[in-house]
Amino acid sequence: MAPPVSVSEVQVESYLFPPTITPPASTKSFLLGGAGVRGLEIGGNFVKFTAIGIYLDETAIPWLAGKWKGKTAEELADSVDFFADIITGPFEKFTQVTLILPLTGQQYSGKVSENCTAQWKAAGVYTPADGKAIEKFLQVFEPQSFSPGDSILFMHSPESLTISFGKAGDIPETSNAVIENKKLSEAVIESVIGEKGVSPAAKKSLATRIAHVLNHF
Protein backbone atom coordinates (compact mmCIF):
# COMPACT_ATOMS: atom_id res chain seq x y z
CA MET A 1 0.00 0.00 0.00
CA ALA A 2 1.41 3.40 -0.94
CA PRO A 3 1.86 6.01 1.78
CA PRO A 4 -1.18 8.32 2.00
CA VAL A 5 1.20 11.26 1.61
CA SER A 6 4.90 11.44 0.94
CA VAL A 7 7.19 11.87 3.92
CA SER A 8 10.76 13.10 3.90
CA GLU A 9 13.97 11.82 5.43
CA VAL A 10 15.31 13.39 8.63
CA GLN A 11 18.96 14.16 9.39
CA VAL A 12 19.97 13.93 13.05
CA GLU A 13 23.60 14.90 13.54
CA SER A 14 25.48 12.81 10.95
CA TYR A 15 22.79 10.10 10.77
CA LEU A 16 20.08 9.99 8.13
CA PHE A 17 16.71 8.39 8.87
CA PRO A 18 15.07 7.37 5.56
CA PRO A 19 11.40 8.22 4.89
CA THR A 20 10.41 4.54 4.94
CA ILE A 21 12.00 1.42 6.38
CA THR A 22 11.37 -2.33 6.45
CA PRO A 23 12.18 -3.66 9.95
CA PRO A 24 14.05 -6.94 10.52
CA ALA A 25 11.89 -10.06 10.06
CA SER A 26 9.12 -7.97 8.49
CA THR A 27 7.82 -7.45 4.96
CA LYS A 28 5.96 -4.23 5.78
CA SER A 29 7.15 -0.71 5.05
CA PHE A 30 6.94 1.76 7.92
CA LEU A 31 6.74 5.57 7.62
CA LEU A 32 9.15 7.86 9.45
CA GLY A 33 7.02 9.62 12.05
CA GLY A 34 9.82 11.72 13.48
CA ALA A 35 13.42 11.71 14.68
CA GLY A 36 15.61 13.60 17.10
CA VAL A 37 18.60 13.50 19.39
CA ARG A 38 18.77 12.29 22.98
CA GLY A 39 21.21 14.10 25.21
CA LEU A 40 21.87 15.50 28.67
CA GLU A 41 23.33 18.68 30.10
CA ILE A 42 26.63 17.65 31.68
CA GLY A 43 28.93 20.28 33.14
CA GLY A 44 27.25 23.04 31.18
CA ASN A 45 27.51 21.18 27.86
CA PHE A 46 24.73 19.36 26.01
CA VAL A 47 26.16 15.87 25.45
CA LYS A 48 24.43 13.91 22.67
CA PHE A 49 24.19 10.16 23.22
CA THR A 50 21.82 8.78 20.58
CA ALA A 51 19.80 9.71 17.50
CA ILE A 52 16.30 8.21 17.64
CA GLY A 53 13.84 7.62 14.79
CA ILE A 54 10.20 6.63 15.35
CA TYR A 55 8.50 4.79 12.47
CA LEU A 56 4.79 3.93 12.22
CA ASP A 57 2.89 1.26 10.35
CA GLU A 58 0.86 2.97 7.62
CA THR A 59 -2.40 1.88 9.31
CA ALA A 60 -1.54 4.38 12.06
CA ILE A 61 -2.41 7.32 9.82
CA PRO A 62 -6.16 6.67 9.32
CA TRP A 63 -6.42 5.57 12.95
CA LEU A 64 -4.84 8.78 14.25
CA ALA A 65 -6.73 10.96 11.75
CA GLY A 66 -10.08 10.21 13.38
CA LYS A 67 -9.06 12.10 16.52
CA TRP A 68 -6.15 14.35 15.56
CA LYS A 69 -6.69 15.56 11.99
CA GLY A 70 -6.97 19.36 11.90
CA LYS A 71 -4.74 19.91 14.94
CA THR A 72 -1.63 22.06 14.64
CA ALA A 73 1.88 20.78 15.30
CA GLU A 74 1.91 22.84 18.50
CA GLU A 75 -1.36 21.30 19.71
CA LEU A 76 -0.03 17.78 19.11
CA ALA A 77 3.33 18.56 20.73
CA ASP A 78 1.56 19.81 23.87
CA SER A 79 -0.87 16.89 24.08
CA VAL A 80 -0.05 14.00 26.41
CA ASP A 81 -3.00 12.11 24.87
CA PHE A 82 -1.56 12.35 21.34
CA PHE A 83 1.67 10.62 22.31
CA ALA A 84 -0.26 8.12 24.45
CA ASP A 85 -2.33 7.23 21.37
CA ILE A 86 0.85 6.51 19.42
CA ILE A 87 2.28 4.44 22.28
CA THR A 88 -0.86 2.35 22.87
CA GLY A 89 -2.53 2.46 19.43
CA PRO A 90 -3.43 -0.90 17.78
CA PHE A 91 -0.71 -0.64 15.13
CA GLU A 92 2.96 -1.54 15.02
CA LYS A 93 5.72 0.96 15.74
CA PHE A 94 9.44 0.67 14.99
CA THR A 95 12.10 2.55 16.95
CA GLN A 96 15.68 2.96 15.71
CA VAL A 97 18.17 4.11 18.36
CA THR A 98 21.48 4.96 16.67
CA LEU A 99 24.51 5.49 18.88
CA ILE A 100 26.40 8.79 18.74
CA LEU A 101 28.65 7.79 21.67
CA PRO A 102 29.74 4.21 22.47
CA LEU A 103 27.64 2.26 24.96
CA THR A 104 27.48 -1.28 26.33
CA GLY A 105 24.34 -3.38 26.16
CA GLN A 106 24.32 -3.64 29.95
CA GLN A 107 24.45 0.15 30.36
CA TYR A 108 21.49 0.60 28.02
CA SER A 109 19.30 -2.27 29.24
CA GLY A 110 20.03 -1.64 32.90
CA LYS A 111 18.66 1.89 32.78
CA VAL A 112 15.61 0.95 30.69
CA SER A 113 14.69 -2.03 32.87
CA GLU A 114 15.19 -0.04 36.07
CA ASN A 115 12.83 2.67 34.85
CA CYS A 116 10.21 0.19 33.63
CA THR A 117 10.19 -1.77 36.88
CA ALA A 118 9.96 1.37 39.02
CA GLN A 119 7.12 2.73 36.90
CA TRP A 120 5.11 -0.50 37.02
CA LYS A 121 5.59 -0.95 40.77
CA ALA A 122 4.56 2.66 41.43
CA ALA A 123 1.40 2.07 39.40
CA GLY A 124 0.71 -1.21 41.20
CA VAL A 125 0.69 -3.24 37.96
CA TYR A 126 3.97 -5.18 38.28
CA THR A 127 3.56 -8.96 37.91
CA PRO A 128 5.89 -12.00 37.94
CA ALA A 129 5.45 -12.20 34.15
CA ASP A 130 6.82 -8.67 33.89
CA GLY A 131 9.82 -9.70 35.99
CA LYS A 132 10.54 -12.56 33.57
CA ALA A 133 10.20 -10.19 30.59
CA ILE A 134 12.73 -7.82 32.17
CA GLU A 135 15.11 -10.74 32.82
CA LYS A 136 14.96 -11.72 29.16
CA PHE A 137 15.44 -8.09 28.10
CA LEU A 138 18.62 -7.89 30.20
CA GLN A 139 19.89 -11.22 28.84
CA VAL A 140 19.45 -10.12 25.21
CA PHE A 141 21.55 -7.00 25.77
CA GLU A 142 24.20 -8.48 28.11
CA PRO A 143 26.75 -9.57 25.45
CA GLN A 144 26.25 -6.50 23.25
CA SER A 145 28.56 -3.53 22.82
CA PHE A 146 27.68 -0.60 20.58
CA SER A 147 29.97 1.75 18.67
CA PRO A 148 28.95 5.08 17.09
CA GLY A 149 26.75 4.30 14.07
CA ASP A 150 25.44 1.02 15.50
CA SER A 151 21.70 0.78 16.15
CA ILE A 152 19.36 -0.77 18.69
CA LEU A 153 16.10 -1.64 16.92
CA PHE A 154 12.70 -2.25 18.48
CA MET A 155 9.51 -3.46 16.80
CA HIS A 156 6.58 -2.60 19.06
CA SER A 157 3.66 -4.92 18.33
CA PRO A 158 0.44 -4.74 20.38
CA GLU A 159 1.43 -7.78 22.46
CA SER A 160 5.21 -8.13 22.02
CA LEU A 161 8.59 -6.43 21.64
CA THR A 162 11.04 -7.59 18.96
CA ILE A 163 14.69 -6.60 19.48
CA SER A 164 17.40 -6.43 16.82
CA PHE A 165 20.88 -4.96 16.57
CA GLY A 166 22.35 -3.23 13.52
CA LYS A 167 26.03 -2.57 12.94
CA ALA A 168 27.49 0.47 11.16
CA GLY A 169 24.18 1.75 9.84
CA ASP A 170 22.87 -1.57 8.52
CA ILE A 171 19.36 -2.87 9.22
CA PRO A 172 19.65 -6.66 9.72
CA GLU A 173 17.26 -9.09 8.05
CA THR A 174 16.64 -11.10 11.21
CA SER A 175 15.83 -10.21 14.81
CA ASN A 176 17.67 -11.23 17.97
CA ALA A 177 14.72 -11.84 20.29
CA VAL A 178 10.97 -11.52 20.75
CA ILE A 179 9.60 -10.81 24.22
CA GLU A 180 5.88 -11.46 24.62
CA ASN A 181 4.94 -8.65 26.97
CA LYS A 182 2.56 -5.82 26.11
CA LYS A 183 3.67 -3.53 28.93
CA LEU A 184 7.35 -3.78 27.98
CA SER A 185 6.59 -3.09 24.32
CA GLU A 186 4.74 0.09 25.28
CA ALA A 187 7.20 1.12 28.01
CA VAL A 188 10.21 1.17 25.68
CA ILE A 189 8.62 3.59 23.22
CA GLU A 190 7.05 5.54 26.09
CA SER A 191 10.56 6.09 27.46
CA VAL A 192 11.33 8.03 24.27
CA ILE A 193 8.11 9.95 23.49
CA GLY A 194 6.01 9.67 26.66
CA GLU A 195 5.30 12.48 29.11
CA LYS A 196 8.80 12.07 30.58
CA GLY A 197 10.38 10.93 27.30
CA VAL A 198 14.15 11.18 26.90
CA SER A 199 14.03 12.88 23.49
CA PRO A 200 12.05 16.14 23.37
CA ALA A 201 13.53 16.66 19.90
CA ALA A 202 12.02 13.39 18.61
CA LYS A 203 8.66 14.32 20.18
CA LYS A 204 8.65 17.73 18.49
CA SER A 205 9.63 16.18 15.14
CA LEU A 206 6.90 13.55 15.49
CA ALA A 207 4.21 16.12 16.31
CA THR A 208 5.27 18.41 13.44
CA ARG A 209 5.45 15.68 10.82
CA ILE A 210 2.31 13.80 11.87
CA ALA A 211 0.29 17.05 11.96
CA HIS A 212 1.37 17.66 8.35
CA VAL A 213 0.57 14.09 7.28
CA LEU A 214 -2.87 14.09 8.94
CA ASN A 215 -3.83 17.46 7.50
CA HIS A 216 -3.09 16.17 3.99
CA PHE A 217 -4.75 12.80 4.56
Swiss-Prot record:
Disulfide bonds: none annotated. It catalyses: a chalcone = a flavanone. Its EC number is 5.5.1.6. Petals. It comes from the Eukaryota. It comes from Eustoma exaltatum subsp. russellianum (Bluebells). The record marks 108 as: Important for catalytic activity. InterPro entries: CFI, Chalcone_isomerase, Chalcone_isomerase_3-sand, Chalcone_isomerase_bundle_sf, Chalcone_isomerase_sf. One of its GO terms (biological process) is flavonoid biosynthetic process. Part of the biosynthetic pathway for all classes of flavonoids, a large class of secondary plant metabolites, many of which are brightly colored. Pathway: Secondary metabolite biosynthesis; flavonoid biosynthesis. Catalyzes the intramolecular cyclization of bicyclic chalcones into tricyclic (S)-flavanones. Responsible for the isomerization of 4,2',4',6'-tetrahydroxychalcone (also termed chalcone) into naringenin. SUPFAM superfamilies: Chalcone isomerase (SSF54626). PANTHER family: CHALCONE--FLAVANONE ISOMERASE 1-RELATED, CHALCONE--FLAVONONE ISOMERASE 1-RELATED. It is an enzyme of class 5 (isomerase). Belongs to the chalcone isomerase family. Keywords: Flavonoid biosynthesis, Isomerase. One of its GO terms (molecular function) is chalcone isomerase activity. Substrate binds at residues 50, 115, 191. This is Chalcone--flavanone isomerase.
